[in-house]
């Protein structure tokens, strides 16, 4: 009660600060965001605080500060996002999602993306399934229409495409209602994603050499899958086929580029292949714990492996594509985590280990990190499989005691004497 006697008057005073008190109002936005949890317990005080933050968003545009540009969203945007997450049900009941029209293209993109994520959480907290579907579609429609128009335009700028993908991602990542509300019905994000699938495919073809666009596109895929979880299954086959085809085409273009460089002709640009491999890892994360999905995922890993092996044929190739090396071996490690039996009993494991032995000769921190991580996971999975089967462990593993902290070398001299 004593806190209430201080917090409520402080918030009321903050909301009445004059517009020209810029520094005080910015700190007021921080105060409101800090007490989002308190506001949830006192819903009658939410509306004036929200109105204050909306005014602050518009003021930041009209009266930019002389300070160095913030790398993240403004204080008002972060506070408003915090309120959306903490007070989602209350704001959903007040139809707060309508404020989208006030902020789109009227505030800096970072602020807009932050608030869109919050609005996604508000939509997910709606009382009925129909309201969640309607709200998700309302939030996604403007960037979806803009992205479709850009996909058909010959003069589309990659940055403009990336911005629309960012907006869609912001909506999809938080618009996930509870399983009780879904009750077996289609996930609202999946419906939006499925309707946009032809547009996504067109963008991936049209902008295949743009690292910015492909990375943003795959990030959108990732958050759609994470939001839908198991509800993404109807799109899984199309997703894996698309990722594999994009990876194969990119590898073919990269190999053609290497050949053209050798014969002195012009180098052809290729897509950021690691983004497609990372998305395949997300497929494993979301569906690798279901036994019936293992054959499908193993087929995906096999296809990804063949494509990567076609490009990574020497230490020089490993050094040229360190991001692909890192993501590929993390993909293989993740499959071992979820489905060890399929890979340990497959000839594919030998090919991966052979590729890893080549990668160990590359002096690149990120690439080596992925290769070494896989080697460690593979060893651990193999030992665990042997223990479960009851077969004897190799002498090197059964006789030596595990290394202790005290056994670690403490100086270069210790290493030289070892």
Residue ranges and their predicted role:
Residues 1-418:
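Karyopherin-beta/Importin-beta family HEAT-repeat alpha-solenoid scaffold
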């Amino acid at each position: 009660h004593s806190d209430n006697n201080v917090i409520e008057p402080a918030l009321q005073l903050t909301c009445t600060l004059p517009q020209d008190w810029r520094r005080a109002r910015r700190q007021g936005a921080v105060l409101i965001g800090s007490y989002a949890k308190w506001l949830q317990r006192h819903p009658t005080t939410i509306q004036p605080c929200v109105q204050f933050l909306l005014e602050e968003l518009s003021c930041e545009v009209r009266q930019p500060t002389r300070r160095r540009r913030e790398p993240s969203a403004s204080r008002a945007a972060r506070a408003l996002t915090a309120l959306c997450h903490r007070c989602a049900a209350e704001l959903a009941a007040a139809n707060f999602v309508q404020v989208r029209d006030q902020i789109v293209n009227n505030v800096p993109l970072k602020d807009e993306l932050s608030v869109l994520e919050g609005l996604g959480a508000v939509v997910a907290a709606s009382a009925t399934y129909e309201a969640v579907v309607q709200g998700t579609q309302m939030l996604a429609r403007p960037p979806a229409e803009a992205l479709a128009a850009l996909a058909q335009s010959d003069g589309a700028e990659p940055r403009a495409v990336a911005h629309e993908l960012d907006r869609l991602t912001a909506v999809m990542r938080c618009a996930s209602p509870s399983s009780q509300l879904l009750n077996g019905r289609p996930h609202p994000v999946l419906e939006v994603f499925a309707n946009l699938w032809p547009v996504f495919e067109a963008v991936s073809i049209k902008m295949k050499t743009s690292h910015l666009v492909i990375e943003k596109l795959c990030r959108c895929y990732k958050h759609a899958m994470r939001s839908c979880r198991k509800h993404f299954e109807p799109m899984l086959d199309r997703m894996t086929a698309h990722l594999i085809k994009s990876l194969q085409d990119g590898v073919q273009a990269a190999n053609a580029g290497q050949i053209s460089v050798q014969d002195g002709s012009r180098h052809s640009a290729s897509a950021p292949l690691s983004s497609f491999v990372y998305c395949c890892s997300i497929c494993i994360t979301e569906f690798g714990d279901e036994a019936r999905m293992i054959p499908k995922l193993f087929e995906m890993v096999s296809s990804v492996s063949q494509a990567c092996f076609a490009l990574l044929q020497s230490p020089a190739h490993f050094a040229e594509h360190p991001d692909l090396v890192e993501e590929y071996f993390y993909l293989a490690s993740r499959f071992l985590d979820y489905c060890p039996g399929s890979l340990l009993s497959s000839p594919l494991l030998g090919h991966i280990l052979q590729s890893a032995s080549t990668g160990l000769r590359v002096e690149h921190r990120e690439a080596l990190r992925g290769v070494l991580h896989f080697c460690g996971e593979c060893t651990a999975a193999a030992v665990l499989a042997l223990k479960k089967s009851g077969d004897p462990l190799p002498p090197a593993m059964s006789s030596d005691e595990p290394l202790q902290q005290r056994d670690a070398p403490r100086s270069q001299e210790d290493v030289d004497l070892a």
